[in-house]
A protein has these predicted regions:
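Alpha-helical solenoid repeat scaffolds
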Residues: 1-153
Length: 153
């Protein structure tokens, strides 16, 4: 029985970020800090920091944490360059003025250049926040889940 409990806890630890990003799991037994510490025990020490940063940004974007997005990393090793400030400003302005079509096109400009795993975390987080702001929460969550799946593979 304890072996099954251990396997269940491990499966929950692995699935938690996806469930949280999808809006399924909001008040379970894990939070970002607990998940991060458990994740650090299971994998290479450099990877959890990047995963935690990306997950923190995604959850902030989906849950309305605009101030958290301002703290986005400027670069990451082996990844994409930070997004263009002019495109980010245009995206934020379009979302603030509830221009859905323009917001969607700017998100495509930011994220449409490759796979979601290649995008800069700030571009992804700002895109999700803008989609949520114009009422496209379901689409934002779907992009967040797909991004987490791509990054975990």
């Amino acid at each position: 029985a304890s072996r099954q409990d251990g396997q269940a806890q491990e499966a929950y630890r692995q699935a938690w970020p996806l469930a949280r990003a999808a809006g399924i799991e909001g008040d379970g037994s894990l939070d970002l800090k607990t998940w991060s510490s458990r994740r650090a025990l299971a994998v290479d020490s450099a990877q959890p920091d990047h995963e935690k940063t990306v997950l923190r940004l995604l959850l902030a974007a989906l849950e309305g944490g605009r101030e958290e997005l301002a703290m986005a990393p400027l670069s990451r090793s082996g990844g994409a360059a930070p997004p263009s400030p002019s495109v980010l400003y245009s995206l934020q302005r379009a979302a603030a003025e509830a221009r859905r079509g323009e917001t969607a096109l700017l998100v495509l400009q930011l994220l449409g250049g490759g796979t979601l795993g290649d995008d800069h975390p700030q571009a992804l987080a700002e895109s999700l926040a803008a989609l949520v702001e114009v009422g496209l929460r379901t689409e934002a969550r779907a992009i967040a889940v797909e991004s987490l799946l791509v990054q975990s593979s």
